[in-house]
Amino acid sequence: MKVIFLQDVKGKGKKGEVKEVPTGYAQNFLLKKNLAKEATTQAIGELKGKQKSEEKAQAEILAQAKELKTQLESETTRVQFIEKVGPDGRTFGSITAKKIAEELQKQYGIKIDKRHIDLDHTIRAIGKVEVPVKLHKQVSSQIKLDIKEA
């Protein structure tokens, strides 16, 4: 019996796959637990339509990420921070991914989730720093920071 998997089933198939499985297994397990549905011509047509719309949405997200990358890599995009500095040249407060995301939103109107900013440790020194940011699975960029003494 041919089925379309609605969810991932370990060892059998992934969501959206059309596969031939034993009839008893399909009727007694997959269909009863709503893990799959019978692969009729109508169901296969619906699946193809869904896949096309998902691909289109993914392409749109990728295009937005690439546009954001060009904005971030522009020479004029440099996030400014003015911090109080101690006698040893280190800032009193530290600059975190959350702070970077907030300042980027405030100064340039660019909204990035703080979890996408790849900061190994908080920044505590003054100067110019570049921080990697993952915008999409296929697109990554750098955020330029300019940390100055107050």
UniProtKB/Swiss-Prot annotation:
TM stretches of this protein: none
The family this protein is said to belong to: Belongs to the bacterial ribosomal protein bL9 family.
GO molecular function: rRNA binding; structural constituent of ribosome
UniProt-listed GO biological process terms: translation
Gene3D superfamilies given in the database record: Ribosomal protein L9, C-terminal domain, Ribosomal protein L9, N-terminal domain
UniProt KW keywords: Ribonucleoprotein, Ribosomal protein, RNA-binding, rRNA-binding
Function noted in UniProt: Binds to the 23S rRNA.
Keyword RNA-binding: yes
InterPro entries: Ribosomal_bL9 (IPR000244), Ribosomal_bL9/RNase_H1_N (IPR009027), Ribosomal_bL9_bac/chp (IPR020594), Ribosomal_bL9_C (IPR020069), Ribosomal_bL9_C_sf (IPR036791), Ribosomal_bL9_N (IPR020070), Ribosomal_bL9_N_sf (IPR036935)
Protein name as catalogued: Large ribosomal subunit protein bL9
Pfam families: Ribosomal_L9_C, Ribosomal_L9_N
Annotated SUPFAM superfamilies: L9 N-domain-like, Ribosomal protein L9 C-domain
GO cellular component labels: ribonucleoprotein complex; ribosome
